[in-house]
Structures are given as C-alpha cells and as structure tokens.
Amino acid sequence: NDVGFYLFKLPFVTFVLDWLFMAVAFITLLVVATHVLSGGIVVQPPRPKVRRATKAHVAVLLALLAVLKAGDYWVTRYELTTANRGAVRGVTYTVDNAQLPAVLLLALIALFTAALFLVALKTESWRPAIVASALWAVMALVGGVVYPAAIQSLVVNPNQKEKEAKYITHNIEATRHALGIDQVTEEQIEFGSLTRTEVEDNVAALQDIRLVKPDEQMVTRFRYDKGKPGQTVNDLDPDRYEVDGTLRQVVVGASELDLDQVGNKSWQGTHLINTHGCGLVMAPAAQFQASGNPAYRDDIVDLDRPELYFSPSLTGYAIVDTTVNETPCPGAETADYEGDSGVRLSSTVRRLAFALDEFDYNLVGSSSINSDSQVLMLRNPRERAQALAPFLSFDGDPYPVALDGRVVWVIDGYTTSSRYPYAQTADLSQLDPGAGLDHTLNYVRNSV
C-alpha cells in the first residue's frame, strides 16, 4: 500500500471497526439484560434456561462480534508497521516472525468461532462455539503476548545485530524519507586563501553582511528607541527589502499594541479605542550609527494602512466600526477599519451571544456599538491559523511583511503524522518550544 493508506485510510478503518465492535458489544449486553428481564433467559441451577429464539438472537450478535474482531486482527497487520517492539520502530524480527503469524492465526480462529456460533442456530449446541472461544482466548494470550516476548528474549536479544539488520535498514530508509532528508547530498568544499581580487569582486555581498542580529538584546534596543505610546516591539526578524535602490538585508519588527501602556484603560479604551498597533520598525542589517545604535530607517517601505489589528501579542477581542473613534497611527488623522475579518454584530441576539461567551455585559449595554460593528477575535496569527486549519501544526514565530501598502503576517505550517510506516519517532526535545512541533511525530513537511 502507498503511504496515503497508512496516514489516512487506515486510521479511519480502525476507527470504524473499533466503533462497530463497541456498539455491537453494548447492544449484546443490552439484549442479554432484556432477555433476562423478559424471561427469555432464566437463571436457575444447574444451568440457565434459554429460549430458542433468545439463543438465536444472542448467537447472531456473538458471531457478528467475532467477525468484527477478525477484521480488527486483519487491520492490525498494517498497524504493526508502526510497532515499538525491537531495536527500531516498525516491523522488526519479532513482529515479522512472531506477531504477524499470531495475528493471522487469531483472525482465522475468530472467523471459525463466528461460523460455529451460526452453526449453533441449527444444531442448538453451543459447546463447539464455547470451546472455540476458549481456544481463542488462550491463543490471544500465548500468540499475542507470550510467544512474541519469548522470541524477543531468547532469539533476538542474544543475536540482535544479525536478526535486526535488515529491519534497521528499512527503518533508516523510511525515516529519512519521512523527514524529507533522503534527497540530501554532501559536497566537499575546499577554501583557499582570500585574495584582493575576490574581495573586490564581492564588495556588494560583503557590504551586506548582517551585523544587526535579531536577538533579545536587539529587541530591547528597538523597543527603547522606536517604541511609541501604547505600542511595543516584541520580536525582530531578518528579511530583505529594497534600500536606496538595492536589495538589502534588514531587521524588521512590528510595532504592536500594548494595552498595559495605554492611558485609557476603561472598557471603551481597551476594546473600542485602542484596537491596533501601527506599522513596522526597520533597520539595515549591515549598518550601525556612530552612537552604536542600529541605523533606523522609516523610508524603506510605504504603508497606506499601517494598522495592525492582528499580531502575536494581542489577546482578547476588539470591536471596530463603532461610533467611537479609534486611536489613529502617527501621521494619520483617523483610523477606520476597512476589513471584513470580524463577526458583524448585526442583531441583539448576536450581541447577547458574544456577551455570554465573553462574560462581558458591556457588549449588550454599550450604545457605541451598532449594526455595522464587527468583533475581531483570535487576533494572534498563529491561533487564528490553528483555528482555521486544526489539522496542521504552525510555527510559533509569525513574521510581518509589508505587502501592497499594508502589513501581513507570514507563518509556516507543517503537515505531520505519527503513522508513517517503518519510520522512527522524531526526538523533539531539543526543538525550541515555539517551533510548533510539540507532539509525537515521525513524518513532517513544511508544506504551508
């Protein structure tokens, strides 16, 4: 089967089989209880008395349970490609030579038991089916647990290098492909002495070597030098923009809203008036001022709409298009939200619903809100993207980009899975907590 079968079809089939088995098991218990209460089953010594119709009813249900379990055993063969038994993840010597044969045998026993339950409908003798069920239970213990453990301990562990060699090779190949490193090539590069001619031929590149590093110390410097009232710089990212007609490396940060610094901390101030940050702060990465500060530039990009209604530090909600004027960005007279990313409060019912959701009665009582007003929620770009596509994993460091006169946020998304056959589980313990890959996986692609 192709990889898509293991990542998509197999989990669905497993879920359906498990759900059906649990449902039929519950129905069987319910049916037995009903027959006991209605007299179909009379508990008396030396053995219960069961009506013929009741036997048939229960026999069919037990046969169905056995068939479903046989299907589960059959699907388990594919699930073993991600087993954790042996030196590596996936099919190992023990899985291949002990567990797989045992699972196939259990599937056959389950089908045989189902057939005997159906035969009991005619013969009215449950003894063969009961004996088969007992044999099934013994084989499940011996073949599913004892035998594989014995093979692992007595055969594999003393001869692991010989027994597991080909399975380790399969694991390495699958892991490299699952993590996207199977196409990596190595090249040996030898560097000679740097000559004057080489320096003169690469002056432009040398002049653009990054000196301003986007580290925490530089974030503090940007925040101190370029911070505006009610706004702050929380993060810096490297990027490239055209500076004086030449594409240059720059360090860029978003001037985000900081409600802790605003003067008006009333409900209107924090939800209707101070609703956004303002623009970007930039500095060429290869330049410093004589004072030692970055060479800040305000003319690298021209923003028609510098307002940042969404940014990583924003929490809670904001309401726009109200009768209250929002705080304008520097150089602007007014700030009017022109987007449609909010939920319009077009009725009293909607206002009441949001008030209950936020436990905030001001959403109902405020006279500043009208039918054109919008509620902006999930204003953190990562949280917003995660709500939109919960099946993806998103990087914890969105970065701002000036595009078409406004600021947009770019965020990396990953497709991940823990079900790639034969591949080893990735060790994520050394990743930055904000990397977005905080769960068990053995397959990842930076696809989004």
Question: What is each stretch, according to the model?
Answer:
Residues 1-448:
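Soluble extracytoplasmic regions of secretory-pathway and membrane proteins
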